[in-house]
Amino acid sequence: MARREPIAFDAEVQRFFQFLVDSYGMAGPEYSELLLPGVLYERPELRVWVFLQAGDGAGTQIDVDVCLPNRDWPAKAELRDLVEAAVFAPRHRVAHKAHTPDAARKTLDENATWLRRLMPLLLGPDVEALMRKANERQVDCAGNPKKRGPDVKWKFD
């Protein structure tokens, strides 16, 4: 059996997220390992971070965070919450697994697809409302997430 080489995280992120530079004029990629391996893309009104989180109980995973800089409130949301807030799909449909090189590439590819779909909203006039909705956590009295109503019509489900 052939030995599998680990992925070069920054190179793989660049391969899948290059559309941010080509189509949206974002600066980057800028690689950092301050706390977690991460790749940053940015423009004055928007930042996108792609992180590799290793060693937690869920195994290695990839997270994509979107931030609106220069706001007087914490304008940051995870990709999976933005996908649900935009009524594209339930948050659990956004991939995050990276336990193998193939799983990491699949997750990066799917995350890039979700971000492509979100970019018009993230650069649109209602971006702050979308970010606030993505950060709303409706929970029951025990702290569990409340179920969505049965009438939700997902755009990409």
Residue ranges and their predicted role:
Residues 1-16, 28-157:
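Intrinsically disordered, low-complexity regulatory regions enriched in serine/threonine/proline
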